[in-house]
Amino acid sequence: MSVVSIEELEKARAYGRPLAGLDLGTKTIGVAISDLGLSFATPRAYLPRKKFQEDAKALLHLLSRENAGGVIVGLPINMDGSEGPRAQSTRAFVRNLQPLTKLPFAFWDERLSTVAAERALIEMDVSRAKRAQRIDSAAAAFILQGALDRLQALRADPGG
């Protein structure tokens, strides 16, 4: 399927199924899954990055296993609002993944999601070594939660 706006995702997603959130890092792919009511995002184990074909196979397997009805992908926008090489790389990954699945994709501004995730893990007194293992999936949960909150607001006020 194609990339849709967050507003269009409500109609494009498969109803009764959770949404997945992704944080595409250079070494790992952070993953989070929503509940069926699309209220809460929960981090899942990250996927180590390899070559695209291997990444795609592992990711599509995970999305199938979780019965995801759509995918929110964190878009690393610069603080000034511009898109740099990381955003271009993220868009290219999704563009290459689209022909392999019928799931709709939506991008979500991920600015400061990793910072927020790290602060949350520090507040939970997670050791530095374990934070390194959990940071990408925690960031994916922050990304997904932001999108879920927006979807909830759209359902409450369809005009805005």
Curated annotation (Swiss-Prot):
GO terms for molecular function: nuclease activity. It is found in: Cytoplasm. One of its GO terms (cellular component) is cytosol. Keywords: Cytoplasm, Hydrolase, Nuclease, Ribosome biogenesis. The keyword Hydrolase applies. The keyword DNA repair does not apply. One of its GO terms (biological process) is rRNA 5'-end processing. It comes from the Bacteria. It is an enzyme of class 3 (hydrolase). InterPro entries: RNaseH-like_sf, YqgF, YqgF/RNaseH-like_dom, YqgF/RNaseH-like_dom_sf. Its EC number is 3.1.-.-. HAMAP family: Nuclease_YqgF. Belongs to the YqgF nuclease family. Could be a nuclease involved in processing of the 5'-end of pre-16S rRNA. This is Putative pre-16S rRNA nuclease. It comes from Chelativorans sp. (strain BNC1).
